[in-house]
Amino acid sequence: MKLCILLAVVAFVGLSLGEEKKEKDKELGTVIGIDLGTTYSCVGVYKNGRVEIIANDQGNRITPSYVAFTADGERLIGDAAKNQLTTNPENTVFDAKRLIGREWSDTNVQHDIKFFPFKVVEKNSKPHISVDTSQGAKVFAPEEISAMVLGKMKETAEAYLGKKVTHAVVTVPAYFNDAQRQATKDAGVIAGLQVMRIINEPTAAAIAYGLDKKEGEKNVLVFDLGGGTFDVSLLTIDNGVFEVVATNGDTHLGGEDFDQRVMDHFIKLYKKKKGKDIRKDNRAVQKLRREVEKAKRALSGSHQVRIEIESFFEGDDFSETLTRAKFEELNLDLFRSTLKPVQKVLEDADMNKKDVHEIVLVGGSTRIPKVQQLVKDFFGGKEPSRGINPDEAVAYGAAVQAGVLSGEQDTDAIVLLDVNPLTMGIETVGGVMTKLIPRNTVIPTKKSQVFSTASDNQHTVTIQVYEGERPMTKDNHLLGKFDLTGIPPAPRGIPQIEVSFEIDANGILQVSAEDKGTGNKEKIVITNDQNRLTPEDIDRMIRDAEKFADEDKKLKERVESRNELESYAYSLKNQIGDKDKLGAKLSDDEKNKLESAIDESIKWLEQNPDADPEEYKKQKKDLEAIVQPVIAKLYQGAGGAPPPEGGDDADLKDEL
């Protein structure tokens, strides 16, 4: 059995040889690996036999998953967006990953929107984000916000590689359901990326850990606690074969929840001391959020930290101490809750604690000493491995998988065997969940089962597809449904309806039903129609994304041409005012002529802050036309050549 699975998966990771493959690899170009995180994202590429984690334009190897829209029409993504959160909280969007692929009625969505500074609205039974842009209020699907972050990672990679990138491997939490996986793929399409593979974050981290491990078979537990999600996966690693044995987790648990506990504590404390409730003041809340996050990070290395915020609320300052002990007390139940999935994974894998050879901690929240201590104690004092960077491991593994798919050298020995995280089945009489594919089944996989009708002469059966672990479908998650019609009249129990489930390498499900008597067949790819974007939606969002990119480009051109004129005018003004330099060489008439032209340009700038780039360029040319002859005359008098002007003619001069 294992051999068959291995063969299937070897085919799936694209390890076939021959000319056809080489041609295909050329078409793909360089495939990048992206860790699309709740709070931070990271991008890597496999080049020349090694992984490069790529720094963004700020020099940072991780980029905040933040998007902001400013009052002057600028769209900011990453560090720039996060840096202005406290001054523009209503139009700074984060945590899109906590909304993506979820329904409006989801209890987690309803919990989260109470704490977001931006407005979340219902549209087509799904959460959408409403912000003010320069064109007025605009509503975005979570997929669009995630697409903007993916687009930023794509740009970061393109700047490093010096060429366009069109294909990517994107990671998701292992416990993401079908709808969340589909929505993440859609976000990639909107960003102009073909997502070749969705892989699970702990699996990617295991690749990062185990890539160079050659010492025989090892059982590795990956404990991945990030900013917004938590996963545990147990893998067997053996000479380049990565087999996921079991996985579990919580798609709504992470560093942000720890921050929120601390914030709630300080908000209550402030109300008790000052009698003031800051919850309605978005700016104050976001200032507190920023400082609490910093304090949490500091407490990983020290035992207490002082939180100081000037002009916190209604002119008052904020000054409080947070100790590591208090931080742990506020979050102890959440920290302890991470051990339940660890226990579950061991049970599902039919292993004991002592069977685990290595524990790999991934995600920024595993830097919290108490989390490390709890994991260590759970495994009887076993020290977790510290060989990989918890912030970069997932992107690293994604980049390796991207290298495999694009046929990079030295990757042909890597085989990835992942599993589906949740049981999948259909509803049968009485609302019973009949399982077809149990959780932790190696994917890709296909499973069929024959069913029959529940009543005499029934000519239609409705196939309702669910995922979840509960015995009754009402307690599980409906993925989609379809009808098989035209069943010939027959007593109940006679017709034979074969239902087949097929899960692809991305963990995405296709279901078909066939009437064995007539050969009549229906099938659907589960796209969670109520939840999923339609192809029309995606096309519209792609157009919107392109429009935003054009607007960003135009804005950049406008800002650059404005800056050129401004710097030129002020630089001249300063030089003319300098009595030791240019100011001393000009006659009063020349000085007055230049000052008058410069003042006119500065006045025009103040009156036209949003002019077109061409207008700024024309103003600069006009100013140069007045300035250049005066300066040229000075240089000729001194027997030298005039300095190059700032206009187009500068390019014609010989270069040294």
Curated annotation (Swiss-Prot):
SUPFAM superfamilies for this protein: Actin-like ATPase domain (SSF53067), Heat shock protein 70kD (HSP70), C-terminal subdomain (SSF100934), Heat shock protein 70kD (HSP70), peptide-binding domain (SSF100920)
Subcellular location per the Swiss-Prot or TrEMBL entry: Endoplasmic reticulum lumen
Principal place of residence: endoplasmic reticulum
Region of interest: Nucleotide-binding (NBD): 126-280
UniProt biased composition (Acidic residues): 646-656
Annotated positions of the O-AMP-threonine modification: 518
Xref: Gene3D superfamilies: 1.20.1270.10, 3.30.420.40, Actin, Chain A, domain 4, Substrate Binding Domain Of DNAk, Chain A, domain 1
Gene Ontology MF terms in the entry: ATP binding; ATP hydrolysis activity; ATP-dependent protein folding chaperone; heat shock protein binding; protein folding chaperone; protein-transporting ATPase activity
Region (Disordered): 634-656
InterPro entries, per the entry: ATPase_NBD (IPR043129), BIP_NBD (IPR042050), Heat_shock_70_CS (IPR018181), HSP70_C_sf (IPR029048), HSP70_peptide-bd_sf (IPR029047), Hsp_70_fam (IPR013126)
Binding site residues for ATP: 37-40, 97, 227-229, 293-300, 364-367
Substrate-binding (SBD): annotated span: 420-500
Family, per entry: Belongs to the heat shock protein 70 family.
Protein name per UniProt: Endoplasmic reticulum chaperone BiP
UniProt organism field: Drosophila melanogaster (Fruit fly)
Organism classification: Eukaryota, Metazoa, Ecdysozoa, Arthropoda, Hexapoda
